[in-house]
Amino acid sequence: MSEMTPREIVHELDSHIIGQQNAKRSVAIALRNRWRRMQLDAALRQEVTPKNILMIGPTGVGKTEIARRLAKLAKAPFIKVEATKFTEVGYVGKEVEQIIRDLTDAAVKLTREEQMAKCKFRAEEAAEERILDALLPKPKEDWDTEKKDDTGTRQVFRKKLREGQLDDKEIEIDIAAPQVGIEIMSPPGMEEMTSQLQSMFQNMGPGASKRRKMTIKEAYKLLIEEEAAKLVNPDDLKEQAIELVEQHGIVFLDEIDKICKRGDTSGPDVSREGVQRDLLPLVEGCTVNTKHGMVKTDHILFIASGAFQMSKPSDLIPELQGRLPIRVELEALSANDFKRILTEPHASLTEQYVALMATEGVKVEFSESGIERIAQAAWQVNERTENIGARRLHTVMERLMEDLSFEASDKSGSTTVIDADYVNAHLENLVQDEDLSRFIL
């Protein structure tokens, strides 16, 4: 679990997302409160429930990006799901529980990686011995002896192995055969039975190893993973993973506005309202049966987000509104925000294009006037057509760089300066013509 302070979390989010300080502060506080809760005594800890968040804002302003970055910062089980997935044809009520099953799978993977990292030193030693055994096979008469022959020759090879002198040498070694993935088609609502059948068939499969020829460098990596996996206790793994989900799990529900009953429609809207009612027990707290064990959702943090262009937060059923007490509004982006998005974030769009062109030997420089004009063009198209926020920058940049990207392989060693004149020459007609910008940008 992350021990970062709210200020540190916001600072980290600032390096990837421009603006939206209110949303950043809310998720930072929510994440820090997870840590604060764990410092309480057990009795009080059970009473402190997470304050779920509803993020409201137009498309392309950073709602999903905040979730993506939060997943990396949290160091906790995290899953992002689209609420619209549960309104599809064939939907039945039990399917929402798949959210918790997927979250538990993520926790198992996270816990396994942590435990394997702790065993890495022992795994490296075991992998080293197996490679030395392959390089220096024992004589037939010594196969029954338990004591490993640690002669001077073995020590010489051990030294060479550690120094990387044998990395390119090929050896034949037994590697555990990967489990065969079995796909089972089942109707909606039968996910639990499907996962149990898959586990049963996989366990029935042979656990035999497969002899493969590869370089020592490749074999060493595979053997470390194999030996580390052997050192992980599966029962402890499941127990820790379930504890991790229950105490630190985070679920991001995207597009929640799409399961609202539309304000201007009459009559029942069974599918959408049904999804909301089935989400209620998860958000409020219930017990879900997973293949790893029973998981309680009482302390899982839910962050919901939606554009709410065709509906309002008040169109959600009252019970679900009550389970999302913290409301955060994200603001629409201005031309100045677009300018900052192009330059300030880590691995910004302009940095990406400069790096891509550099692989062809073409130097690209973005001038201040060029960046301003790109931002202005993207903002103008958003104003005249559909406002899709910062995603418009991807379309505009791709259109702007199209000619250069096509010709880059023939221009190795050249320098291209992208200033206002360059942008106008490549984009002005499209931006000015509303019909063209509607279909092309």
Swiss-Prot record:
Question: What does the UniProt entry say about where the protein is found?
Answer: Cytoplasm
UniProt keyword Cell division present: no
One cellular-component annotation, GO: HslUV protease complex
Sites binding ATP sit at: I18, G60, V61, G62, K63, T64, E65, D254, E319, R391
What SUPFAM superfamilies does this protein's entry cite? P-loop containing nucleoside triphosphate hydrolases
* tRNA-binding in keyword set: no
The alphabetized list of GO BP terms reads: protein unfolding; proteolysis involved in protein catabolic process
Name the UniProt key words of this record, in alphabetical order.
ATP-binding, Chaperone, Cytoplasm, Nucleotide-binding, Stress response
GO MF annotation, one = peptidase activity
Q: Name the PANTHER family on file.
A: ATP-DEPENDENT CLP PROTEASE ATP-BINDING SUBUNIT CLPX-LIKE, MITOCHONDRIAL-RELATED, ATP-DEPENDENT PROTEASE ATPASE SUBUNIT HSLU
Name the family: Belongs to the ClpX chaperone family. HslU subfamily.
What is the stated purpose of this protein? ATPase subunit of a proteasome-like degradation complex; this subunit has chaperone activity. The binding of ATP and its subsequent hydrolysis by HslU are essential for unfolding of protein substrates subsequently hydrolyzed by HslV. HslU recognizes the N-terminal part of its protein substrates and unfolds these before they are guided to HslV for hydrolysis.
Subunit relationships: A double ring-shaped homohexamer of HslV is capped on each side by a ring-shaped HslU homohexamer. The assembly of the HslU/HslV complex is dependent on binding of ATP.
Q: Tell me what this protein is called.
A: ATP-dependent protease ATPase subunit HslU
